[in-house]
Every structure is written in C-alpha cells, then in structure tokens.
C-alpha cells in the first residue's frame, strides 16, 4: 500500500507485473522453470505454517502470480491477505503427528490422536474409528509416496470422520483448504510434483 497516495476514499497499491499462476502457456513462454516454481510454492506455504506460524489462507489461483524475473529461480507474488491463519502450538504438533501416523499406516494411533484432540465426539470407540480411517485411506497409501495426492488423502481422511461428528478449529479448516489449493496448483504447473519430498524437511 502506498500511504503517500492513499486517502479515506482511495486505496493505492503498487503494480505487480506477474503471470497468473495457472496460465501455463505464459509461464512456458517466459521460460520459467516449472518444476522449481511448483516446489517453491509448497515450500513457501509450509514455511508459513510450520516456521512463521502465519499463513495466507486464500491462495486460490487469482491471488498468486509468478515473477518474470530470474526464470531458473522463479518466485511468487501473493496478493489479497484478507484471510490468514495461525495454528496453536498444540495443533501444529497434532498435524505433524497426524501426517506421521498416515505415512506409517498406524491407523490405531491416528484414531487415538483424533479422540485425544477432541476432533470427534467423546464416546467414539478407537477401534471403530480406526476401521473407518483404514478403509478410507489405506488404498491411497498403496502407491509410491511420490504419487500419493496429499489433498485426496486429507479429503478421504476427514470424510471418514464425518460420522463421528468431526470438528476442526477454523484455522485448521483454512489450513486444509489451502493445502489442497497449493498441491492442486503445484501439480497443474508441474504434474510430476512430489509433494512429500518437498514437505519432508518441515
């Protein structure tokens, strides 16, 4: 925002000369490294979540642009920060444990985790929840890790929990929605995006 020119009636912001992130034709025309671009998108968001603990929660394609500068090391412009999120420390830990349980196929511990977190109704039986989570997610985990769609896995996971009165904090809902957007955009830019390899350091 350019304060010098902004008044009560007029909001003046700098002009961003970027390429809409899903305009693949223009990204290629400017010789942007699409693999690096897609991987950096995942890194940027995960850094916001796990290191900065303040994330842009409205990262749909209309709010994300790619810079035309340094095509081999492309970077992003993100606009419209009207919706942002921040996780409590306990939810950060729970999220990391949830992903770990999924990758290890430890559905019993995953069920215990959800009950402990009060994400399901209090009379939920661990064995019943474990069975549903396994039925919804195990087949997706049979693929090589690089081919597992994180967004699809999360949707199946939470779909199975609906019958147990799934409840998530607003910031967790924002996080899940944004993660799905990020992975989807990343794979649209570079279909062979390996979300898990990029996410591993976090």
Located regions from the model:
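Conserved catalytic cores of large enzyme domains
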Residues: 1-202
């Amino acid at each position: 925002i350019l304060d010098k020119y902004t008044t009560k009636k007029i909001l003046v912001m700098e002009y961003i000369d970027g390429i809409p992130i899903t305009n693949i034709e223009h990204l290629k025309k400017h010789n942007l490294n699409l693999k690096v671009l897609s991987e950096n998108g995942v890194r940027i968001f995960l850094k916001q979540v796990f290191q900065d603990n303040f994330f842009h929660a409205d990262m749909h394609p209309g709010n994300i642009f790619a810079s035309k500068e340094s095509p081999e090391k492309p970077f992003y412009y993100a606009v419209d920060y009207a919706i942002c999120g921040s996780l409590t420390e306990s939810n950060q830990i729970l999220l990391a444990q949830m992903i770990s349980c999924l990758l290890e196929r430890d559905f019993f511990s995953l069920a215990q985790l959800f009950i402990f977190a009060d994400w399901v109704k209090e009379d939920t039986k661990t064995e019943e929840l474990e069975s549903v989570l396994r039925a919804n997610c195990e087949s997706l985990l049979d693929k090589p890790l690089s081919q597992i769609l994180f967004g699809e896995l999360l949707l199946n996971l939470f779909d199975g929990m609906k019958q147990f009165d799934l409840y998530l904090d607003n910031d967790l809902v924002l996080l899940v929605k944004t993660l799905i957007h990020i992975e989807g955009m990343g794979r649209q830019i570079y279909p062979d995006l390996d979300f898990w390899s990029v996410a591993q350091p976090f």
